[in-house]
Amino acid sequence: MGAATNQAPELWGAVAAHVPFVDVLNTMLDETLPLTPIEWPEWGNPLEDKAAFEHIHSYSPYDQLVAGTFPPMIITAGLNDPRVTYWEPAKYVARLRHLAECSNNIILKTNMEAGHGGSSGRYNAQYELAEEYAFILDHLQTGPERQS
């Protein structure tokens, strides 16, 4: 959702992004992360290949953010996520807020116990999904009764 939102923010009434891979370049530059070296054959190694660096930079959502009006967004992170580290969504949200030329909600929700798949437990995942649905429905609601 990061790249799609960056390219055409006006198309989205609200966005929910689950543990989004939005800081692609910095992740692919960090060989200490468990998945980075095994991803190089597919993505290219930006540490050794300037063309790979430039290509990844050209589409990395974090690197392609520019000032503008963004839709309301709820973005999640899992503190124990080994695939998309929690700081990726956090950096992205911080930059979105800094560049936003609007007052739309841009929310970061970090689950302090979750990994990449979100909450575990009998009802926790449904609770999180209901929260996101409520966020989206609230922001898509229209009519004179809607107050911003």
Placement of each model-derived feature along the sequence:
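Active-site-proximal cap/loop segments of hydrolase catalytic domains
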Residues: 1-148
